[in-house]
């Protein structure tokens, strides 16, 4: 198997120029680096909305597309909140924004200083995504923004603690139970 990597750094970040467009037509994946994500210390600083791959992953593509849709909508809500503020955002939109932030923090970022979180085997990646997908697709009995923020921060921390456990161990299972009990306690219906 041969893997070839190439880089293109268009002047001013203009991806419409001919060399960049020609390169994008022949590659199987694109990792768009983001100054904004790097400045926010979100590593790896690969922009999750601009980046793409033609290769089959370990996670069901329909679920990936649904998660990507949540991420896009969360980004739109974030841009809207920069203009009108958090106060002008409905609780429903704020929950969707928090879901996107959760997806970004617990699945798209990693802690390279943690020997367990630095690399993830495909089975664990698929398993964790399925749990995260369940979190993302549920409706929650939350209405106050302070409560929404606190809830998603707590869920985020439980995910990050889960990332520090070895896959398949009793500690891994115990942390997963703690996480699922937490988010299911606020599920409606």
Model-predicted segments: where are they?
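C-terminal non-catalytic accessory extensions
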Residues: 167-189
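P-loop NTPase catalytic core
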Residues: 1-160, 168-176
